[in-house]
């Protein structure tokens, strides 16, 4: 009995490690504290994946906890947000935009000009024509045209200098407008402007939005065409005459120019200093009736005037130093010594025969 009791005591010691299911209690872990949030995280509580109350460390159900104390906003908020924007607030915590933002949106829209001040869809020629046709005398001065346009269209009350220059340009460079001088009974400044009688109906059925055709005076057009054709004809005629002159100059042979008469060689010799510059007499007068042996027959005519011929070089040795030829350095002898001349001639002939 006692042993069994002892065994039960040992068994109780071993079975104490396995408690019953009803006696098991899950431990309650304390809620961990979060680090202080910065100002950026406090502004947007919806972006956080965790509930605003904190994190639960244990997945098991826990006992009832005390309700959390209300927390104050941890960081500053934007000035444009409402007072309800806090850490525990919802998306509706962002306040409505202030009146300054609404006013800025209204100013962002483009300023739209009223219809009465819009630019009229008429050209300057149309405006001038309307003003002149509605005048009692069918003519107006330049200042009256300006005033009529500004009274009818408020758009032209601004930037007057720009469109008034265009009006003057249209009056001056269009043939449909004619300048009329003032009559003595209507004194004043400036001439009148009227429509040309032949301009007719320039616009389609009185609609001034588009002109039917541009009016031009036929006289000016004819003068312009004639001047253009005359200019073209003159240009073509001058080009043709220049071509003819060039062709004549090419086809006509070049005429020899007259050479001035040369002065006698004796005078040039006297100017040089008394030297004998007379050309040697030709060999034809001396040998017309002379019969020479076969070995002494004359060769074909030879140019004795060549400065480097053998005849000139040999004659330089026989001639005296004071009687040199000016042209070729001592050719031949004086006219009074024919022997020396024939001696040089025969020596040349013998050299050629050999």
Swiss-Prot record:
Residues 61-73 have a biased composition (Pro residues). The keyword Transcription regulation applies. Keywords: Activator, Chromatin regulator, Developmental protein, Differentiation, DNA-binding, Nucleus, Transcription, Transcription regulation. Transmembrane segments: none annotated. GO terms for molecular function: DNA binding; DNA-binding transcription factor activity; DNA-binding transcription factor activity, RNA polymerase II-specific; protein domain specific binding; RNA polymerase II cis-regulatory region sequence-specific DNA binding; sequence-specific DNA binding; sequence-specific double-stranded DNA binding; transcription cis-regulatory region binding. Residues 81-92 have a biased composition (Gly residues). It comes from the Eukaryota. Residues 238-254 have a biased composition (Low complexity). Residues 52-92, 219-280 are annotated as: Disordered. The keyword DNA-binding applies. This is Hepatocyte nuclear factor 3-gamma. Transcription factor that is thought to act as a 'pioneer' factor opening the compacted chromatin for other proteins through interactions with nucleosomal core histones and thereby replacing linker histones at target enhancer and/or promoter sites. Originally described as a transcription activator for a number of liver genes such as AFP, albumin, tyrosine aminotransferase, PEPCK, etc. Interacts with the cis-acting regulatory regions of these genes. Involved in glucose homeostasis. Involved in regulation of neuronal-specific transcription. May be involved in regulation of spermatogenesis. GO terms for cellular component: nucleus. Pfam families: Forkhead (PF00250), Forkhead_N (PF08430). The gene is Foxa3. Gene3D superfamilies: Winged helix-like DNA-binding domain superfamily/Winged helix DNA-binding domain. Interacts with FOXA2. It is found in: Nucleus. Residues 118-209 bind DNA. Residues 225-237 have a biased composition (Polar residues).
């Amino acid at each position: 009995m006692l042993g069994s009791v002892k065994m039960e005591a040992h068994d109780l010691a071993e079975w104490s490690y396995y408690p019953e299911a009803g006696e098991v209690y899950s431990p309650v872990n304390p809620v961990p504290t979060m680090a202080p949030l910065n100002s950026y995280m406090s502004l947007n509580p919806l972006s956080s994946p965790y509930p605003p109350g904190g994190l639960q460390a244990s997945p098991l159900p826990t006992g009832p906890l005390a309700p959390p104390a209300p927390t104050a906003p941890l960081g500053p908020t934007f000035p444009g947000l409402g007072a309800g924007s806090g850490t525990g607030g919802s998306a509706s915590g962002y306040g409505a935009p202030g009146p300054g933002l609404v006013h800025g949106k209204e100013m962002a829209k483009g300023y739209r000009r009223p219809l009465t001040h819009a630019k009229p869809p008429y050209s300057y020629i149309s405006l001038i024509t309307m003003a002149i046709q509605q005048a009692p005398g069918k003519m107006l001065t330049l200042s009256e045209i300006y005033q009529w346009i500004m009274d009818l269209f408020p758009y032209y009350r601004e930037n007057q200098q720009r469109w008034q220059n265009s009006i003057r340009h249209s009056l001056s460079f269009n043939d449909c407008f004619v300048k009329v001088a003032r009559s003595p009974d209507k004194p004043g400044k400036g001439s009148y402007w009227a429509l040309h009688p032949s301009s007719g109906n320039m616009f389609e059925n009185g609609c001034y939005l588009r002109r039917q055709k541009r009016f031009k005076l036929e006289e000016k057009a004819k003068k312009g065409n004639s001047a253009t054709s005359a200019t073209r004809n003159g240009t073509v005629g001058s080009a043709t005459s220049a071509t003819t002159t060039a062709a004549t100059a090419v086809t006509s042979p070049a005429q020899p120019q007259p050479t001035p008469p040369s002065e006698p060689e004796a005078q040039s010799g006297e100017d040089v200093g008394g030297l004998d510059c007379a050309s040697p007499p030709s060999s034809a007068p001396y040998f017309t009736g002379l019969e020479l042996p076969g070995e002494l027959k004359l060769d074909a005519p030879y140019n004795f005037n060549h400065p480097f011929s053998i005849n000139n070089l040999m004659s330089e040795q026989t001639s005296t130093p004071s009687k040199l030829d000016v042209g070729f350095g001592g050719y031949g002898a004086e006219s009074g010594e024919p022997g020396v001349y024939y001696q040089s001639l025969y020596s040349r002939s013998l050299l050629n025969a050999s």
